[in-house]
Amino acid sequence: SATTAEWTRRNLDETAKRYPAIAGNYHLDIADATQMPTLSQLDGTIDIVLTNPPYVPLADIPEQPEVRDYDPDLALYGGSADGTLIPERIIARAAKLLRAGGLMVMEHDITQGERLAAFARTCGFVDVTVHNDYTGRPRYLTAEKQPAQ
């Protein structure tokens, strides 16, 4: 959202003022992470993609009031009835961005692990594993892009 982008710009500006020696390490691109042209100049060069995308199924209203009442829908809902549309698009994009042997880590809904893991495999990921959170619920996956042969 425009508001999120503005706050990110402010945070980057403040970081640059406080830590000028590392200011050049940061660059902000405002783009749709699910679209193939986004950051295409970096395809095949990224070591790790760490993502907490919108993944809530459209019919699921979050129980936590701090989420339900304050987080924008854009940050919550995964774009389809089961909430996997946006996560699957990000998996496909990550498969292009990552170098051979690169790692993707993605948070997801407790109902989505196996589907997203299967999709990651079709995108060329190996060693795909769904992991449990501290409460024992399947909440994130790790996947390695096929190493170079």
Whereabouts are the PLM-identified features?
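S-adenosylmethionine
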Residues: 1-147
